[in-house]
Amino acid sequence: MKPIVIEARNIVTRLGENLIHDSISCTIRENEIYALLGGSGSGKSTFLREMIMLETPQSGSIHIFGKDIADLSLTEAQELRKQWGVLFQSGALYSSLTVGENITLLYKEYTDLPPALIHELVKLKIDLVGLPTHAIHLYPSQLSGGMIKRAALARALALDPKLLFLDEPTSGLDPLSSRQFDALIQQLRDLLGLTVVMVTHDLDTIHHTVDRFALLGEKRVIAQGTLKEVLAINHPIVDYFFQKESHGIQG
Ligand SMILES: Nc1ncnc2c1ncn2[C@@H]1O[C@H](COP(=O)(O)OP(=O)(O)OP(=O)(O)O)[C@@H](O)[C@H]1O
Ligand SMILES: [Mg+2]
């Protein structure tokens, strides 16, 4: 078995009065495309935000690359952050900057590379995610939804991370663009040896792109594993997602 990249154990999260996670655990291994699936409000984004150190659970532990993320010095935390890229749900590009400038910003913030080299790297990343070369000069408002996702992905990949976090990468995209984006994620995983963690509602993504996933519900992990393993579990939430919804998709 491949080495473990992320190990979350017994995570308990309270936000205000709300108990969001009541002891959730999951194990994500190198080179996997791993998804967090669950109904709206089941705490998927919150869990993702805890993994990337934007929020802190009340108890439990998260180890990434073997390090307990609750137990890092500032320098260690900064070093660890450089090893992952994040694609937020909205894309979160700066609207006043071009695609090229959006990506450049990251290199300026985290590296001392000379401008000419940064420019070459930006062009490479834009090419890597399948955007046309001229996209470097475009503003986010001039891009389609699919192109915005790709531009945000190019930025997430700027520092050559080994780990990629995606929050609802195909939401808002039409079915064809969604499948193309899924295919891109798989290609990049293979090409760059990435480990990918994504929050998704997209059952096509679960069926065709994801290796394993955790189904969140009732504040817990209802099921975890490959699609086949999860489907073998007898639980109303599993039925809800995979019988009702697949029935709906087939019309
Ligand atoms: N700052 C906060 N204070 C209190 N409650 C919050 C806060 N942020 C989120 N919540 C609540 O936490 C729960 C989980 O939110 P989260 O965004 O993680 O869900 P989600 O599974 O990502 O949902 P969606 O699929 O709609 O994106 C929700 O009930 C939400 O209302
Ligand atoms: Mg969410």
Task: Report each predicted region and the residues it spans.
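Conserved ABC ATPase "signature" region
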Residues: 116-134
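Helix-to-loop junction immediately C-terminal to a conserved catalytic motif
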Residues: 52
